[in-house]
């Protein structure tokens, strides 16, 4: 299976650089994965596609203000993208610099000195030397780390709009974007309809934006991300399936979390890292349907939806979305695959 099989041409003007005024005003492409039938709806119509007894599973991870700036002691400028916090004074980060900082050197993160303890590939391990911790630095100076394809600096509204309304557990470098369409009003309508809701956590890493670099899909090595699938979520899933309801994952992060916890065919609580890679030929044990945004060409996420719905059907759906001028990627429109 070739990575190029998952390529497609997207007109640049269809990349959504800004969100719509209202979260739930986006469009929704409905795809029947059995028949391949495609239909166009508004996102608010999603309420009509779910039934009492269904279970929606959301990722409640919160995006960190992970973009920070600083300098070497020489004054040379540095840009940070915080990837993972080990403890309040110890964290992993990407660093953009003309010349990479050396292991053992001291550098500034905003106004605070930090020591470079280690480097692994493009990832640095830093320890803060000053009084402030990384949470305080992000709170005081941090920027929302918008995806590179938006080609703009973050603005004030991004702090709210690049965050789901139910975000709770701080740790992501990118938003679980399928959830961005859900307004507080729509969440209430879902509850009022008798549809159950559950929350898992997957802290999205920056690797989510990276295209697959190898020619053969099977050779790709996934980046690891931290997830939590609590026992009460597993109980809800078992109950839903026993009662004939559907488990509907909101976003590929929820899909990957649930399928990690259900790898042995039976859903079990899971806490730790996952590097699960779902591509055509892989089996789904837990998820019956999903809401997802449109994904980048050659990405692991377009491979995931192709595994769920069949590659030809996904490519046709994407061609339809391009012809109908859907908006793509993080601030773009969504699909309901069932």
Curated annotation (Swiss-Prot):
Pfam families: Queuosine_synth. GO terms for biological process: queuosine biosynthetic process; tRNA wobble guanine modification. Pathway: tRNA modification; tRNA-queuosine biosynthesis. Its main location: cytoplasm. SUPFAM superfamilies: QueA-like (SSF111337). InterPro entries: QueA, QueA_dom1, QueA_dom2, QueA_sf. It is an enzyme of class 2 (transferase). It comes from the Bacteria. It catalyses: 7-aminomethyl-7-carbaguanosine(34) in tRNA + S-adenosyl-L-methionine = epoxyqueuosine(34) in tRNA + adenine + L-methionine + 2 H(+). Monomer. Belongs to the QueA family. Transfers and isomerizes the ribose moiety from AdoMet to the 7-aminomethyl group of 7-deazaguanine (preQ1-tRNA) to give epoxyqueuosine (oQ-tRNA). This is S-adenosylmethionine:tRNA ribosyltransferase-isomerase. The lineage of its organism: Bacteria, Pseudomonadati, Pseudomonadota, Gammaproteobacteria, Thiotrichales. The gene is queA.
């Amino acid at each position: 299976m070739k990575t190029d099989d998952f390529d497609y041409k997207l007109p640049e003007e269809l990349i959504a650089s800004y969100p719509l005024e209202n979260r739930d005003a986006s469009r929704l492409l409905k795809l029947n994965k059995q028949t391949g039938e495609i239909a166009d709806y508004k996102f608010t119509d999603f309420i009509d596609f779910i039934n009492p007894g269904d279970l929606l599973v959301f990722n409640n991870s919160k995006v960190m203000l992970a973009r920070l700036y600083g300098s070497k002691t020489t004054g040379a400028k540095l840009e940070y993208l915080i990837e993972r916090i080990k403890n309040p004074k110890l964290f992993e980060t990407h660093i953009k610099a003309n010349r990479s900082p050396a292991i053992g050197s001291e550098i500034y993160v905003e106004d605070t000195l930090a020591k470079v303890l280690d480097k692994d590939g493009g990832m640095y391990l830093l320890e803060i030397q000053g009084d402030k911790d990384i949470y305080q630095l992000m709170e005081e100076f941090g920027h929302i780390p918008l995806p590179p394809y938006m080609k703009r600096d973050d603005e004030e509204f991004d702090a709210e709009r690049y965050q789901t309304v139910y975000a709770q557990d701080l740790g992501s470098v990118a938003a679980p974007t399928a959830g961005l369409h859900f307004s507080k009003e729509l969440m209430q309508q879902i509850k009022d309809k008798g549809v159950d809701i559950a929350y898992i956590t997957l802290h999205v890493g920056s690797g989510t934006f990276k295209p697959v670099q190898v020619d053969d899909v099977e050779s790709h090595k996934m980046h690891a991300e931290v997830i939590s699938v609590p026992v009460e979520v597993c109980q809800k899933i078992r109950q839903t399936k026993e009662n004939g309801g559907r488990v509907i994952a909101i976003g590929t992060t929820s899909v990957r979390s649930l399928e990690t916890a259900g790898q042995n065919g039976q859903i079990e609580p899971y806490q730790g890292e996952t590097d699960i890679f779902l591509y055509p030929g892989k089996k789904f044990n837990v998820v019956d349907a999903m809401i997802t945004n449109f994904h980048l060409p050659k990405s692991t996420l377009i491979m995931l939806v192709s595994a769920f719905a069949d590659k030809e059907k996904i490519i046709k759906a994407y061609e339809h979305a391009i012809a109908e001028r859907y908006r793509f990627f993080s601030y773009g429109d969504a699909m309901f695959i069932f």
